[in-house]
Amino acid sequence: MISNGIGTVTTGKRSMCLFPLLLIGLWGCVTCHRSPVEDICTAKPRDIPVNPMCIYRSPEKKATEGEGSEQKIPGATNRRVWELSKANSHFATAFYQHLADSKNNNDNIFLSPLSISTAFAMTKLGACNNTLKQLMEVFKFDTISEKTSDQIHFFFAKLNCRLYRKANKSSELVSANRLFGDKSITFNETYQDISEVVYGAKLQPLDFKGNAEQSRLTINQWISNKTEGRITDVIPPQAIDEFTVLVLVNTIYFKGLWKSKFSPENTKKELFYKADGESCSVPMMYQEGKFRYRRVAEGTQVLELPFKGDDITMVLILPKLEKPLAKVERELTPDMLQEWLDELTETLLVVHMPHFRIEDSFSVKEQLQDMGLEDLFSPEKSRLPGIVAEGRNDLYVSDAFHKAFLEVNEEGSEAAASTVISIAGRSLNLNRVTFQANRPFLVLIREVALNTIIFMGRVANPCVN
């Protein structure tokens, strides 16, 4: 008998709880093993013997029309790291569309696709057979030129180094991974070593069998500490029980200051028009200045607001009045998004943007199953022999929880050099383009050089805290 966050299943198999977050929960280990690698960011592939129990080789795919016009890879960037970032963007848009389809058009949405992808990449370390194949396909890891699944982990380490070890500290972007394993279980040493070296996921033994509720509280407290208290109570009651073997958690925290701040004196109450035709009053921020902007297909406006340091930006996608945001969501593709971003040019703008705070919490299980990740969640079909020492095939993921938070105000964003242009009053805006986000819009927070989508969401009702 195992209980998960959704229901109860009768089976002889053991469960792993998966908690993406901004977080995720999965596996575990009992003893910690030191690796000779001193710094993963300067290591070479030969320095990190990634030898999981199973390796999947992606089949060769025929070139399709249009291939060969690839973007120029940024300088000093590993090609495979660039491809991994693109794979994450493909997964982000696909997962977002599945999630949006399951929600009401008036619901806010916010998530970190990078957090979800990272946590399931860690799961992939112990996967075999069709379970491994589905993980490679659903998360688009099979699009990376390096065709063997074991090398993905090395490229994830390099991607994390690019994102989280920046010399510029004007924005705060922090990620943390942790394994919480049942203290009675002995876990595969290779799995432990790779998890710690590549993902920085150290083991903390807990007593799931003897005190499941205290274990749940301990994990939730760790998550809260790593997100500055912004993410709490991710794991719901009864999600962990005596059948839980391991929980893997990934957290991402971002806090950034606008490169060009909004003056609080310019913030006024204005109406925001929701998808159902109703309106509500919201503090609307305002400023005039030069920003990267483009009006694209069917009048959709795309605006990029940089944070200090210019390496991380917020992208807003605002449909014209006559076009529902749901239509933009359904039509959006990774290539379309990349094309829009490439076309942005510096434009003198009048920006109206709501002051808002949104929080979202959901299970990712149903969406991932719809995308083809079925075996991992099946007690009968799951194959995760590379996690425990004895190579058992009785483990599966019972559920996967995700919780994310975003706050945007005059100073910047919390989720995260040129002259500041701020007008102390509202002018007549002659010869200026107006970007007025007084209706539902999409929001992305991305790392610019690699175009890595860190966060993604929909602001449908900023009046709800």
From Swiss-Prot:
GO biological process assignments: blood coagulation; regulation of blood coagulation
GO CC, alphabetical: extracellular space
Residues with the modification Phosphoserine, per the entry, are S69
CDD domains, A to Z: serpinC1_AT3
What is the reported tissue distribution? Plasma.
Which Gene Ontology molecular function entries are recorded, alphabetically? Answer: heparin binding; serine-type endopeptidase inhibitor activity
Report the PTM annotation: Phosphorylated by FAM20C in the extracellular medium.
Q: Report the principal subcellular site.
A: secreted
Tell me the residues on which Phosphothreonine occurs: T64
A Pfam family found in this protein is Serpin
Family to which this protein belongs: Belongs to the serpin family.
The subunit structure is: Forms protease inhibiting heterodimer with TMPRSS7.
* Function in brief: Most important serine protease inhibitor in plasma that regulates the blood coagulation cascade. AT-III inhibits thrombin, matriptase-3/TMPRSS7, as well as factors IXa, Xa and XIa. Its inhibitory activity is greatly enhanced in the presence of heparin.
Matching PANTHER family: ANTITHROMBIN-III, SERINE PROTEASE INHIBITOR, SERPIN
Name by which UniProt lists this protein:
Antithrombin-III
Organism the protein comes from: Ovis aries (Sheep)
Q: What is the lineage of its organism?
A: Eukaryota, Metazoa, Chordata, Craniata, Vertebrata
Gene behind this protein: SERPINC1
